Regions:
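N-terminal Rossmann-like or analogous alpha/beta NTP/dinucleotide-binding catalytic cores
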Residues: 37-40, 45-49, 57-112, 118-123
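Beta-rich, aromatic/charged-enriched effector core domains that present basic-aromatic interfaces
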Residues: 87, 92-208, 399-402
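Structural beta-sheet core signal
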Residues: 21, 51-53, 138, 401
Length: 444
């Protein structure tokens, strides 16, 4: 593993004892840099390794089916780990308290964990680290170019981070080594997850997205064969999209972006426009979102908006709105806009919304809300509560782009939006067959 992927975030004296990998973002056994690093450390120290997962009692507005997606996937990951002599332990409660209790309980000598810049994960770490008396190493397994290696500041937009990432890609976009075999087996008694009880508790995941690493790889192969060849032409067409449909798997860490990039680069018969267009989204735009959250602690508030956008939204705060939507109206997909309603119903039915539509969807919420603060809060509640890929850096950056001009520039001034870019129903009709999309989701 490239040493720039790991950093010591809790400097405590080295101790003898097992290695614990606190898995909270990269929920997979394959292609997992944090797991690989933890296994290397355990083998080098002559110590056993286990993986600890803490199911928080709540995760913002996430719904039971989101936990079901996670738990179903974890059951498969646990089987893969067990086959390699690595137990997966699942604890319940507040991660900032429960993980240190577990680490102390097994007399661990070292803890490895996932890097994650989102607000809730920062809070978990802030609570956990003072309670740990062992070194803690954080590994960036989410980004192909580790976020802290790509840039040391918040980037203005894609064009400012793109050359930095492209320069470093040859150094980081490499194949994955095999997971190091464990020389010392885990023998300490640890509770094994009661999968039957957990699956009963959370119910079924959304039918549109079968969970787990195997399903994620199958979805990737389907995309490579069916959708990637036409990605350049159809990626922004919600009716018959060439979208990858990988975002839930990437969000839950059941599939790594680096594996996706390697498969895309190896795929045969793909034109450069399709290949480059997809890799721009997979690498540059995703890692720009990571950069935004890493260097903007208030990434889920209007404080994250650039000064020009904050000023223009304030200037137009009192503009008359064409419609003031109620919360219940939005959640039910019962607005005056048929395209918005269809997008919301797609989200309600599948846990997924097409990427172009999500931008349009958020901008209409701004148009129908008394102010940008209310609009952002509403979008966060709906996106984080309904979307399988919610509660993610890409969602925070995307909503900040849609409502607050983050990673964008001023556009011609309009009512309500000011100089923040607007998107309209008439513009959507010029782009794709809106009537066909509305008809598809009218009864959802």
């Amino acid at each position: 593993m490239h040493p720039a992927r790991a950093r010591l975030i809790h400097n405590r004296p080295q101790q003898q004892g097992p290695v614990v990998y606190w898995m909270h973002r990269e929920f997979r056994a394959a292609d997992n840099w944090a797991l690989i690093h933890a296994a290397e450390l355990a083998r080098g120290r002559g110590q056993p390794l286990c993986v600890a997962v803490c199911l928080a009692r709540g995760f913002g507005p996430a719904r039971p089916e989101h936990f079901a997606f996670l738990v179903h996937g974890l059951r498969e990951t646990a089987r893969e780990l067990e086959a390699q002599g690595i137990p997966l332990v699942l604890v319940r409660g507040e991660p900032g308290a429960e993980v240190p209790l577990f680490v102390r309980g097994v007399r661990a000598g070292l803890c490895v964990t996932d890097a994650d810049p989102t607000r809730i994960k920062r809070a978990w770490l802030a609570q956990a680290l003072p309670r740990l008396d062992v070194p803690v190493i954080e590994v960036d397994g989410r980004n192909i170019v580790p976020a802290r290696a790509a840039s040391d500041k918040r980037e203005y937009m894609a064009r400012t981070i793109r050359p930095k990432i492209q320069r470093l890609l040859p150094e980081f976009l490499d194949g994955f080594p095999a997971l190091p075999a464990q020389g010392v087996p885990w023998t300490a008694p640890v509770p094994r997850p009661d999968w039957a009880a957990l699956l009963s508790e959370f119910g079924a995941p959304p039918a549109a997205f079968p969970p787990g690493e195997t399903a994620a790889r199958a979805r990737l192969e389907a995309f490579l064969g069916l959708s990637l060849p036409r990605y350049a032409d159809d990626r922004d067409t919600p009716v018959e999209p060439a979208a990858s449909l990988l975002s839930p798997y990437l969000h839950f860490g059941q599939l790594g972006a680096q594996r996706v990039a390697l498969r895309v680069l190896a795929a045969q018969g793909i034109g450069p426009e399709a290949r480059d267009g997809f890799l721009e989204q997979l690498i540059i735009r995703r890692e720009l979102a990571e950069n935004f959250c890493l260097f903007t602690p208030d990434h889920d508030t209007p404080a994250a908006f650039p000064a020009w956008a904050a000023a223009t939204l304030e200037k137009h705060r009192a503009d008359p709105r064409p419609h003031l939507a109620a919360e219940a109206e939005l959640e039910a997909g019962d607005s005056p806009d048929p395209l918005w309603n269809a997008a919301q119903r797609q989200l309600l039915a599948t846990g997924h919304m097409h990427g172009w539509l999500r931008m349009y969807w958020a901008k209409q919420v701004l148009l129908w809300s008394p102010d940008a603060e209310t609009a952002l809060a509403r979008c966060l509640r709906l996106n984080d509560g309904l979307s399988l890929d919610g509660r993610d850096v890409n969602g925070y950056a995307g909503l900040a782009w849609s409502i607050g001009g983050v990673h964008d520039r001023p556009w011609p001034e309009r009512a309500v939006f000011g100089t923040v870019r607007s998107m309209t129903l008439s513009g959507a009709r010029r782009k794709f067959d809106v009537a066909a999309f509305v008809a598809r989701w009218a009864g959802a």
